[in-house]
């Protein structure tokens, strides 16, 4: 059973917080939005219960692992990379690639079109044991295809065409696109990105499931947590906490002028979750002059860089803390320097205890300063809890789209830059 709770009390009880009447007034719109999600579910709502994607991903992952792969390079950008990176960073050992007994290949993410990073990946992989997974629905994403062509060239040079082709996976649209044509031409292993699922909503498709399974993560539990979120939405409707959160964040923006939403995660392992959510919220809602600006932060690190602004800067933010109650591992603080009052008091505590105390201290300080804040609590950092949370945040984003009156599934604002890039790089049919 997933253990994820949403605490919105400090959006209601602080000075300038929301009122019960405001939530009552918006409730008909919430019910309508949830009704649409459940009656005509978008693609991401169906993923947790789609066995075929899970089974296909597990089958390919087993091929990779049984082949004795030393390296697995995941090539993608945006949601095609951020989602898989969340799963790996949150659920794997923090230094997974350095472990001598990982039980699986090293994972590398070729995301940005950065020559230094790409060259670095080529420096450390062992071509004879490397598998590549290239992820793009269209096969025309410039950054992804450029990275793929470079890695393909290096592997083909080292292994020959047959060797490269035998260790390349294509995750793309099942029917169309340039990458689909390449896969058919070279008889590459293929996984499907459902046509109705956009990249930023694709983490529970083969986009996220394959690299997670390659790393030995419990993808069954991940999907079970997400499915539980959908079940609770069906049971609770507009009272589901993810839906209530959509209303609160929308109202904080529309009626209070708090148009910056900070997700502050109190676990290094969740740093990529904040980055993933920034894309999800920004790209889904930032349209027609609407939408609030998401920002990621990590506690306690950013207490020493950003908290000053949150405490005493402009009243334009809502801080959302993500807290993990039980850490996968904890470390006791040994006794030393007992005569120094500024040091000795730490003895006998644990580092996890310090992290949780500072999390609560930040929440109390923000509330005391009249700064609205919310908390998402995970009982532990498990695959089931993470699946629930990511599904809930996707639901929240979709409902917020209805409240803002925008389509949360398109991204017209990024097309102009793509067209200019295509023209300047010489793609036929495009002019600068």
From Swiss-Prot:
Belongs to the GPI family. Keywords: Cytoplasm, Gluconeogenesis, Glycolysis, Isomerase. PROSITE patterns: P_GLUCOSE_ISOMERASE_2 (PS00174), P_GLUCOSE_ISOMERASE_3 (PS51463). Its EC number is 5.3.1.9. Pfam families: PGI. GO terms for biological process: gluconeogenesis; glucose 6-phosphate metabolic process; glycolytic process. GO terms for molecular function: carbohydrate derivative binding; glucose-6-phosphate isomerase activity; monosaccharide binding. This is Glucose-6-phosphate isomerase. It is an enzyme of class 5 (isomerase). GO terms for cellular component: cytosol. Catalyzes the reversible isomerization of glucose-6-phosphate to fructose-6-phosphate. InterPro entries: G6P_Isomerase (IPR001672), Phosphoglucose_isomerase_CS (IPR018189), SIS_dom_sf (IPR046348), SIS_PGI_1 (IPR035476), SIS_PGI_2 (IPR035482). It catalyses: alpha-D-glucose 6-phosphate = beta-D-fructose 6-phosphate. The keyword ATP-binding does not apply. The active site is at 283 (proton donor), 304, 418. It is found in: Cytoplasm. Pathway: Carbohydrate biosynthesis; gluconeogenesis; Carbohydrate degradation; glycolysis; D-glyceraldehyde 3-phosphate and glycerone phosphate from D-glucose: step 2/4. It comes from Rubrobacter xylanophilus (strain DSM 9941 / JCM 11954 / NBRC 16129 / PRD-1).
């Amino acid at each position: 059973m997933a253990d994820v709770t949403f605490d919105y009390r400090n959006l209601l009880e602080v000075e300038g917080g929301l009122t019960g009447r405001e939530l009552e007034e918006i409730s008909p719109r919430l019910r309508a939005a949830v009704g649409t999600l459940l009656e005509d579910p978008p693609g991401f709502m169906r993923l947790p219960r789609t066995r075929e994607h899970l089974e296909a991903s597990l089958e390919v992952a087993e091929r990779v692992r049984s082949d004795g792969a030393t390296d697995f390079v995941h090539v993608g950008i945006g949601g095609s990379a951020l989602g898989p990176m969340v799963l790996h960073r949150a659920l794997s050992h923090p230094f997974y690639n350095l472990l001598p007994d990982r039980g699986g290949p090293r994972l590398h993410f070729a995301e940005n079109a950065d020559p230094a990073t790409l060259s670095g990946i080529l420096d450390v992989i062992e071509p004879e044991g490397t598998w590549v997974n290239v992820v793009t629905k269209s096969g025309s994403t410039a950054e992804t295809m450029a990275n793929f062509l470079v890695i393909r060239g290096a592997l083909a040079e080292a292994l020959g065409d047959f060797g490269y082709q035998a260790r390349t996976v294509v995750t793309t649209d099942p029917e169309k696109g340039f990458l689909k044509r390449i896969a058919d031409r070279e008889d590459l292993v293929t996984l499907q990105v459902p046509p109705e699922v956009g990249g930023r909503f694709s983490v529970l498709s083969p986009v996220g499931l394959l690299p997670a399974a390659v790393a030995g993560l419990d993808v069954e539990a991940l999907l079970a947590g997400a499915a539980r979120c959908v079940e609770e939405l069906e049971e609770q409707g507009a009272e589901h906490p993810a839906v209530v959160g959509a209303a609160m964040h929308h109202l904080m923006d529309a009626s209070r002028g708090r148009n910056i939403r900070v997700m502050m995660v109190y676990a290094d392992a969740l740093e990529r979750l904040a980055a993933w959510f920034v894309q999800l919220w920004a790209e889904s809602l930032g349209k027609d002059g609407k939408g609030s600006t998401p920002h990621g932060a990590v506690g306690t690190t950013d207490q020493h860089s950003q908290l000053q602004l949150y405490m005493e800067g402009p009243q334009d933010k809502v801080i959302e803390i993500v807290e993990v109650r039980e850490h996968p591992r904890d470390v006791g603080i040994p006794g030393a320097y007992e005569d120094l009052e500024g040091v000795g008091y730490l003895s006998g505590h644990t580092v996890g205890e310090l992290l949780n105390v500072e999390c609560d201290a930040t929440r109390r300080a923000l509330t005391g300063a009249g700064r609205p804040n919310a908390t998402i609590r995970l009982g532990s950092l498990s695959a089931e809890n993470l699946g629930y949370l990511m599904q809930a945040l996707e639901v929240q984003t979709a409902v917020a789209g209805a409240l803002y009156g925008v389509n949360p599934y398109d991204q017209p604002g990024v097309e102009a830059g793509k067209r200019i890039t295509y023209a300047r790089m010489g793609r036929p049919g495009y002019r600068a």
